[in-house]
Amino acid sequence: PIALALARNERIRLHVHLDERASAFFALGLAKASDRPVVVACTSGTAAANLFPAVVEAWTARVPMILLTADRPPELRGVGANQTIDQRELYGRYARWFTDAPLPAQGPDSMRTWMILGHEAYRQACWPGPVHVNLPYREPLVPAGDPVRLGSVATGFAGVSLGEGPSAGEPDIGGFVDAVAGVERGLLYLGSLRTPSPFILDLATRLGWPVIAEPTSGLRIPGTLRAAQFLLSSEAFLEIHRPEVVVQFGAAPTSRAGLGLVGAASRLLIVDPDDLVADPHGRAEHRFAVHAGQLAHGAV
């Protein structure tokens, strides 16, 4: 039923893969490129388990994905039925949201339930990260009844925006401005960024600070230190040019020299719009869940 529903919807671009693991990584790539949630659907049993490696990658890289796993009905779980495993919370902490959907039924109440479920799955994926919707069916390969017409049920959702994830509250732009006020020898260090922002260079220009961009940042902008890793490996260089404050954008550095710099920083500030925990040394003075563009306009 899942595949039939996807195939019947002309607004959905469908890709068919015979291998579940490959299909999940293909969806991961599409989601990375588009920065929009991509759906990957599969049948029940070990097929769902084959999505796990891509789920971990999506969770780590904060890539929006929606996993639709077909399942057997509740009464066939744990009794040795064919192609059945316990798929509830299958991906553990690597799915940022999970729901075990009800069995399909006819009627407006059921349709409204499914509209709410679909909206919430999309909203949660936009946070971003992988979300898991487990879909039990009594007859997994046989469509039942006529196609559902949403009609008036959908009108209640006409004003709902699907483009935003859960609110994290007001960004603490003033707190960042206060933290960097009066600092002359500061440094912006760019780790892996979910959405690379050219506003980081605007912020660096306003502050008058140098920028180090790791390859994983995805930013190729003028003004960054191209030989930074070599310079950071030199204790003599750091003795003279050690910054007062390091502002880390995104994930923690992947290079040994970069990790050493942020780990030994007198003051470390971490900026990530998703409030990513990226402090392996436990040295962060503060984490700011803000976008670089907001900081660039605030740090005047």
List where the protein language model places each region.
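Glycine-rich, anion-gripping cofactor-binding loops and their flanking helix/strand elements
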Residues: 32, 50, 174-175, 187-283
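Conserved thiamine diphosphate
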Residues: 36, 83-129, 295-297
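Phosphate/pyrophosphate-binding active-site segments
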Residues: 101, 105, 109, 262-300
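Conformationally flexible catalytic loops at phosphate/diphosphate-handling active centers
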Residues: 120, 124-181
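Thiamine diphosphate
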Residues: 2-75
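Short gly/pro/ser/thr-enriched loop/turn and capping motifs at secondary-structure boundaries
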Residues: 21-24, 47-49, 72-77, 84, ...
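Short beta-strand segments
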Residues: 41-43, 64-71, 92, 102, ...
